[in-house]
Amino acid sequence: MSDNKAIQTLQNTKEFNEVIKVKGSLIIFDCFSTWCGPCKVIDPQILKLSQAYSDTYFYKLNVDEVPDVAQKLDIRFVPTFLLFKDGEKVAEVVGAKPKALEDAIRANLGCGATHSSN
């Protein structure tokens, strides 16, 4: 996993499988589609969350471009946010709900979480 804190878009199953194996970090998958209005609306808030919670890693997953991963994750609605830690899903937020996503992030971060209030 790179140290670049930009939100990266996963291009294929191999990339997903590599990211999911990372231990010790909270990983958030933003499962979206380009035709999804709520996905576009929440994007700026997701960027803010990725910057506010510096010890998390955010990845975008276009369900139309990587359908096998979307099916494996049982994505039925976009946007869906999946939170993984040590290879296990620890939370799921369905819909464009930034407050619920932030609550899930906070609940799953250990001590030493870095957060800057807005």
From Swiss-Prot:
Which cysteines does the record link by disulfide bonds?
36-39
Biological pathway = Mycotoxin biosynthesis
Cross-referenced InterPro entries: Thioredoxin-like_sf (IPR036249), Thioredoxin_domain (IPR013766)
- On whether Aminoacyl-tRNA synthetase is a keyword of this UniProt record, the answer is no
Per UniProt, residues of the Thioredoxin domain are 1-110
In terms of superkingdom, the source organism counts as Eukaryota
Q: Does the keyword Disulfide bond apply?
A: yes
Q: Note the Pfam families from the entry.
A: Thioredoxin
Question: Any idea which UniProt keywords this protein has?
Answer: Disulfide bond, Redox-active center, Virulence
UniProt-listed CDD domains: TRX_family
**How is this protein induced?**
Expression is up-regulated more than 10 fold in toxin producing cultures.
Q: What else is known?
A: Gene clusters encoding host-selective toxins (HSTs) are localized on conditionally dispensable chromosomes (CDCs), also called supernumerary chromosomes, where they are present in multiple copies. The CDCs are not essential for saprophytic growth but controls host-selective pathogenicity.
Q: Which family does the entry's similarity section mention?
A: Belongs to the thioredoxin family.
PANTHER family assigned to the protein according to its UniProt record, in alphabetical order: THIOREDOXIN-LIKE PROTEIN 1 (PTHR46115)
Q: So what does this one do?
A: Thioredoxin; part of the gene clusters that mediate the biosynthesis of AM-toxins, host-selective toxins (HSTs) causing Alternaria blotch on apple, a worldwide distributed disease. AM-toxins are cyclic depsipeptides containing the 3 residues 2-hydroxy-isovaleric acid (2-HIV), dehydroalanine, L-alanine which are common for all 3 AM-toxins I to III. The fourth precursor is L-alpha-amino-methoxyphenyl-valeric acid (L-Amv) for AM-toxin I, L-alpha-amino-phenyl-valeric acid (L-Apv) for AM-toxin II, and L-alpha-amino-hydroxyphenyl-valeric acid (L-Ahv) for AM-toxin III.
Name-wise, this protein is Thioredoxin AMT13
Q: What is the lineage of its organism?
A: Eukaryota, Fungi, Dikarya, Ascomycota, Pezizomycotina
